Amino acid sequence: MKRTYQPSNLVRKRRHGFRSRLATVGGRRVLANRRAKGRKRLSA
């Protein structure tokens, strides 16, 4: 049986990266929330 998590840095960056977050309204909201909380890392 194939497992659900097959790590790939390219896919990781494309799906959860900073620029993909900025591309959508929801992603911008995520970044704003993480900034407000004081997260050291905003995105992958």
UniProtKB/Swiss-Prot annotation:
InterPro entries: Ribosomal_bL34 (IPR000271), Ribosomal_bL34_CS (IPR020939). Gene3D superfamilies: 1.10.287.3980. PROSITE patterns: RIBOSOMAL_L34. The keyword ATP-binding does not apply. Residues 1-21 are annotated as: Disordered. GO terms for molecular function: structural constituent of ribosome. The keyword Ribosomal protein applies. Pfam families: Ribosomal_L34 (PF00468). One of its GO terms (cellular component) is ribosome. GO terms for biological process: translation. Keywords: Ribonucleoprotein, Ribosomal protein. Belongs to the bacterial ribosomal protein bL34 family. This is Large ribosomal subunit protein bL34. It comes from Rhodospirillum rubrum (strain ATCC 11170 / ATH 1.1.1 / DSM 467 / LMG 4362 / NCIMB 8255 / S1). The gene is rpmH.
